[in-house]
Amino acid sequence: MERRNPSERGVPAGFSGHASVESGCETQESPATVVFRPPGDNTDGGAAAAAGGSQAAAAGAEPMEPESRPGPSGMNVVQVAELYPELRRILTITEDGQGLKGVKRERGACEATEEARNLAFSLMTRHRPECITFQQIKDNCANELDLLAQKYSIEQLTTYWLQPGDDFEEAIRVYAKVALRPDCKYKISKLVNIRNCCYISGNGAEVEIDTEDRVAFRCSMINMWPGVLGMDGVVIMNVRFTGPNFSGTVFLANTNLILHGVSFYGFNNTCVEAWTDVRVRGCAFYCCWKGVVCRPKSRASIKKCLFERCTLGILSEGNSRVRHNVASDCGCFMLVKSVAVIKHNMVCGNCEDRASQMLTCSDGNCHLLKTIHVASHSRKAWPVFEHNILTRCSLHLGNRRGVFLPYQCNLSHTKILLEPESMSKVNLNGVFDMTMKIWKVLRYDETRTRCRPCECGGKHIRNQPVMLDVTEELRPDHLVLACTRAEFGSSDEDTD
């Protein structure tokens, strides 16, 4: 991983010059097109135009624009094709006439590659206040007191631009501050152990994970390293992770982990598994099995994230704060096994009227996972549930200590399922309740059983519940409790 001296000005590695950034696709000649004519139309003008076009192409001149007879609107076929791009596939064929082909899109792959190369060249040649490398900082630390002192900031640390053939683990260990090129695609073929603080900026680059290991990135306990201001723990931002052939966990964090603007596409296992402090902000999870798993005694902050078509978005076994997120078409957006704070989220259920077929056995009983599932716990309090919008969702409420009091939540077309002991512990005076339905479980029918997969990884037998509609028993009487009371507005900052 030879790296040029950052003090030397010039073109970075991988670029022969600024002119080489221009894509070579512009020099390629686009296939000529001729006007589609009905059979039998052998006019002299058409033959002359075809002969003239072939002579001009043979002479190396620019191909002449083919002529055509005017249509009913007074315009020829070429003008119609220019005004209506959707007709180009019918009005244009290849020069050899072997079949219909559509016109290339306005933005091709070559133009996208050229834009990415221009962006990479601009980022790599930009002037920054970088004055010292991570190795020099380690050499300057003679004793343990120097290791604890934060003499430099992340802005002063020299950036290493990772090439597709470089070793991720070695680059993180040696340079700590690593950047990825947006015009390159990276591949992880083995486990990456991270044992020091690092700052990885992806710049929108794609990283494909293709390894048979159980974990792709293991963030282990951090050793004694020099302190750099702004680089606390493992920080990864603006990276797109894909793994069509990977069946393990992407991130296994045993130390502080910050994921900022990271995207996960199509992982059939856990994306982030945290055993300690983790902050996930501005990330996107598309078609993943499990998004964020917070293990016991962990503290997680998940905010401004997007969960789309995930089987299980968030699994909370520790202390979690989930705020300002959006979920769409997820089997279960959040499974709460411990304490949690759920505020300012927008959750849209499945467009199709089908329930999730996955179970949870967290409290010793098997229940179908709902969009937001609060499992029973004899010693835990209810989660804080405020300012959330639920549309076409289902909410499962187990038995807990205290009273579940959702505050200013919109439960639009939402079904609430109450376990037998939790009906008297739910207060719905502060929600928008016109289209909600509340069901209470009376008993479980042991004669009607189904074997379903569970979120723990196994399969269990579930007894079919016998339920009763208790919507009107728990819905507040709005003729007595007016909507102008303090539950829907106050004199503080929440005033309308």
From Swiss-Prot:
Substitution effect: residue 444 to A: Decreased ability to promote ubiquitination and degradation of host MRE11, without affecting ability to promote ubiquitination and degradation of host TP53
Keyword Phosphoprotein carried by entry: yes
PTM comment text: Phosphorylation at the C-terminus affects the subcellular location.
Any one GO cellular component localisation term in the record: host cell nucleus
Annotated Low complexity bias: 45-61
Residue(s) carrying Phosphoserine: 490-491
Localization: Host nucleus; Host cytoplasm
Phenotype upon changing residue 240 to A: Does not affect ability to promote ubiquitination and degradation of host MRE11, whilie ability to degrade host TP53 is impaired
Any one GO molecular-function label of the UniProt entry: ubiquitin-like ligase-substrate adaptor activity
Modification type Phosphothreonine: residues: 495
Domain notes: Contains a PML interaction motif that allows the subnuclear PML localization.
Family of the protein in this entry: Belongs to the adenoviridae E1B 55 kDa protein family.
Function: Plays a major role to prevent cellular inhibition of viral genome replication. Assembles an SCF-like E3 ubiquitin ligase complex based on the cellular proteins ELOB, ELOC, CUL5 and RBX1, in cooperation with viral E4orf6. This viral RING-type ligase ubiquitinates cellular substrates and targets them to proteasomal degradation: TP53/p53, LIG4, MRE11-RAD50-NBS1 (MRN) complex, ITGA3, DAXX and BLM. E1B-55K probably acts as the substrate-specific adapter of the SCF-like E3 ubiquitin ligase complex.
Binding partners and assembly: Interacts with host PML-4 and PML-5; this interaction promotes efficient subnuclear targeting of E1B-55K to PML nuclear bodies. Interacts with E4-ORF3 protein. Interacts with E4-ORF6 protein.
Entry protein name: E1B 55 kDa protein
